[in-house]
């Protein structure tokens, strides 16, 4: 290529690359956000729709980490870097093409030099990042688990004066987590500093060599062109390495989200809109046995009947199966053997799924531990369901039935922020909120 066209060629490449960068910046981030949202939505839907026995075996903290924390990692540290890899590759290809047309010998020399260096870096970094990726997931789950347990045990911590012990233990895990993150960042960014300095030293030695041999004036245009191309292309080469490092670091976190997302099923014919409310006449247990694990029977040959209008209390020591029995009545669990009948019709998701789902829609369940779900009483009563939240008459009826008028008055209405204003809600009021829900 004639040198008089070189400047024009370089300007064209830079204008084109700048235009591409603007459009790709906007497109990549919005596209990555949509993809990440779709994946985490599907993963969360799968978590909520999995069989109840499988769900209760899992750590809720781990599930929160997978859906929220790792879902965010998926966007920032995996999908975005993958898209930026494409952008960097396109730009480097344009620069390489221009350099090849200008001087193919210089092009091949640079390619060989950088390939050799980055091959060694990739080989070394891969071992570090492989270990770091597994640690990242483990540390994150430990931190969330510790926070969940301790913040839900604040009475025990205050009574035992364990505040400093808990904060010191948290600091230990957090330190390990952040040092692991720091090691990843060092691994990803150190090559840029090393290679930039190495290239600068080589250029200075080359200039010195040419100066000694009185050839610097002839080589100056080539050096200037090479320096300009290097200044524009090297950040993208390093970006490729950093993006690869990010993907390697967070791939295990991303895979944990994808593992749920791929099991997503779009159609759910038993959603709320298609469920029928069943009238209740009789609940009957016939020879019901249940065990969570083999050789660990919880219920043994249970037989009883509850008629409409009966008031029944199930009593017994802890661990004898009272909660399990209620879960069987609700249809959350299937008997290991025997039958649970509602109106002389068996409820069992493995045998009669449609009828069981309709029954589950028709029954109310108030657990021992009630979690507040929103900032206002309205959000707690309606479970953040906008359609229910706007049904004023229905909400007023529910409040009257569950005797929550005093609580609503004390909290200055349904829409006051009960968490921000530190309203005291008793255990009994919590239970009635759950009944209202």
Protein language model features and the residues they cover:
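Hydrophobic alpha-helical segments in the permease module
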Residues: 10-17, 21, 114-117, 192-199, ...
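Short intracellular "coupling" helices and adjacent cytoplasmic loop segments at the cytosolic face
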Residues: 33, 41-71, 146-169, 243, ...
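The feature captures the beta-strand-to-loop junction immediately N-terminal to the Walker
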Residues: 315-317
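Cytosolic ends of transmembrane helices, especially the final helix of ABC transmembrane type-1 domains
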Residues: 139, 143, 155-162, 186-189, ...
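Transmembrane helices of ABC transporter permease
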Residues: 83-134, 205-219
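Helix-to-loop junction immediately C-terminal to a conserved catalytic motif
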Residues: 330
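Conserved "ABC signature" C-loop
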Residues: 367-417
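Juxtamembrane loop-to-helix connectors within ABC transporter transmembrane domains
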Residues: 28, 48-94, 180, 189-190
């Amino acid at each position: 290529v004639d040198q008089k066209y070189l400047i024009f060629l370089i300007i064209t490449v830079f204008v084109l690359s700048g235009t591409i960068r603007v459009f790709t910046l906007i497109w990549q981030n919005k596209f990555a956000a949509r993809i990440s949202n779709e994946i985490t939505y599907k993963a969360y839907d799968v978590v909520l729709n999995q069989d109840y026995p499988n769900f209760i075996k899992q750590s809720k903290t781990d599930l929160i980490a997978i859906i929220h924390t790792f879902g965010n990692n998926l966007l920032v540290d995996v999908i975005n870097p993958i898209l930026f890899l494409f952008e960097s590759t396109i730009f480097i290809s344009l620069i390489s093409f221009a350099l090849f047309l200008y001087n193919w010998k210089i092009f091949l020399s640079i390619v060989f030099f950088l390939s050799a260096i980055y091959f060694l870096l990739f080989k070394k970094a891969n071992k570090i990042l492989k270990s770091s990726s597994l640690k990242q997931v483990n540390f994150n789950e430990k931190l969330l688990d510790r926070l969940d347990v301790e913040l839900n045990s604040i009475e025990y911590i205050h009574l035992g004066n364990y505040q400093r012990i808990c904060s010191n233990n948290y600091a230990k895990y957090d330190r390990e987590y952040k040092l692991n993150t720091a090691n990843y960042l060092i691994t990803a960014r150190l090559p840029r500093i090393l290679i930039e300095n190495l290239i600068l030293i080589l250029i200075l030695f080359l200039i010195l060599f040419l100066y000694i041999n009185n050839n610097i004036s002839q080589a100056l245009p080539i050096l200037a062109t090479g320096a300009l191309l290097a200044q524009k292309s090297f950040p993208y080469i390093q970006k490729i390495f950093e993006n690869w490092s990010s993907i390697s670091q967070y791939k295990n976190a991303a895979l944990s989200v994808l593992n749920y997302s791929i099991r997503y099923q779009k159609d759910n014919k038993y959603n709320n809109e298609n469920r029928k409310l069943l009238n209740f006449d009789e609940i009957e247990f016939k020879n019901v046995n249940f065990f969570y694990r083999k050789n660990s029977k919880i219920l043994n040959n249970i037989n009883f009947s509850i008629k409409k209008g009966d008031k029944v209390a199930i009593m017994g020591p802890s661990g004898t199966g009272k909660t399990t029995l209620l879960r069987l009545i609700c249809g959350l669990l299937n008997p290991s053997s025997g039958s649970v009948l509602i109106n002389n019709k068996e409820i069992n998701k493995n045998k009669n799924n449609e009828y069981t789902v309709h029954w589950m829609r028709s029954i109310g369940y108030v657990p021992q531990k009630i979690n507040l779900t929103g900032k206002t009483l309205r959000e707690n009563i309606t479970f953040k369901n906008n359609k229910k939240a706007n049904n004023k008459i229905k909400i007023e009826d529910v409040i009257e039935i569950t005797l929550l008028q005093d609580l609503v008055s004390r909290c200055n209405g349904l829409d006051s922020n009960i968490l921000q204003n530190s309203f005291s809600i008793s255990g009994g009021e919590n239970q009635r909120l759950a009944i209202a829900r």
